[in-house]
C-alpha cells in the first residue's frame, strides 16, 4: 500500500510544475516599463528608462505591502537609501498592490525615502516574478531583487523569500558597479 501511495505521489509531483526560480538572468536586458507608483505618499508615474538615465536601479519585488517581511524589508531599504544614493543608485520597490496602498506604504514603511510602484501583470510576467502556490499564480510577486546597470543590463539577481540579504547583496552589487 505504501509503495502505491509513494508511486502516486511521485507521479503527481511530475504533473505539478515546480516553483521555478526562472527570474531574469544576470546579463539580460531589463524590460522597460511605465506604471504608477508613490513617493512620500504622492502618486507619480514611474518609468524604468527614465530612472536608468540617472544611474543604476535597484528594482526589488516584494509580495504584499504591510505584511511583516515586506515591512521589515522596506525599513531595511529605507535605512540604506543614503548608501545607495552615494553609490549613484535609485531604489524602487514593486508589488501588485493598488495605488492607495502604495501611497500609504511609501510613507509608513518606506519612510518617504524611496518610491514603490504597481507591478502590473505585464511587469510580473516580463520579470518572471510571479509567486506560485501549488503551481498556480497567486497574483503576488516573489521576493526578488535586481540590480540594473545604467545601460539596462541586469548585473545581479537575488530571489529569496527571506528579506534579510536583499539590501546587503544589492548594495554590494551597486558599490561594485561604481568602482567599475
Question: Where do the model's predicted regions map?
Answer:
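Short loop/turn microsegments at loop-to-beta-strand junctions
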Residues: 31, 56, 142-144
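A short beta-strand-turn-helix
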Residues: 34-56
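Short, acidic, Ser/Thr-enriched surface-loop or helix-capping motifs
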Residues: 24, 38, 118, 148-149
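N-proximal helix/coil linker or "cap" segments that precede and/or mark the start of modular domains
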Residues: 4-6, 11-37
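Short, internal strand/loop/helix patches
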Residues: 106-142
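Thiol-/selenol-based redox modules, centered on thioredoxin-like
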Residues: 140-180
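Structural microenvironment flanking redox-active thiols in thiol-disulfide oxidoreductases
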Residues: 71-112, 123-125
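Short active-site neighborhood of thiol/selenol oxidoreductases, capturing the structured segment around
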Residues: 48-71
